[in-house]
Amino acid sequence: MTVTAINSLEEFHELINSGKRVVIDFWATWCGPCRVISPVFEKLSDANPDVEFRKVDVDEQSAIGEEVGIRAMPTFISFKDGKKVDEVVGANPANLENLIKAIASA
């Protein structure tokens, strides 16, 4: 499954309040660890079709990053029913996989 970008604060709110289970990768183009873990995130999206996988470029969509309190990149946050469920800060594949397993079974 292709991971698509969230392009507005409104789109972000619609997505997290849609009732879907969502995992968002908050990243930046200049972030080396973000580029390293991106293929892992893509692969996990293929393996978990019941979870919506999206990305937010924090430089382009700073309002979203500010709203959820992003302090470092990459940060992965899971949402369900409009609420934050969990987050992983840093390019840690094992922790990311655990976050996705947890939201997939929520």
Where are these regions (language model features)?
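Short pre-active-site segment immediately N-terminal to redox-active cysteine/selenocysteine motifs
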Residues: 20, 27-30, 72
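Non-catalytic, surface beta->alpha helical segment in thiol-disulfide oxidoreductase systems
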Residues: 77-106
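Conserved Rossmann-like nucleotide-binding pocket used by diverse enzymes
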Residues: 2, 27, 52-54
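Conserved redox-active cysteine motifs that mediate thiol-disulfide chemistry
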Residues: 26-39
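A short beta-strand-turn-helix
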Residues: 4-22, 62
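Structural micro-motif
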Residues: 62, 68-79
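Conserved helix-turn-beta segment immediately C-terminal to the redox Cys motif
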Residues: 19-21, 36-56
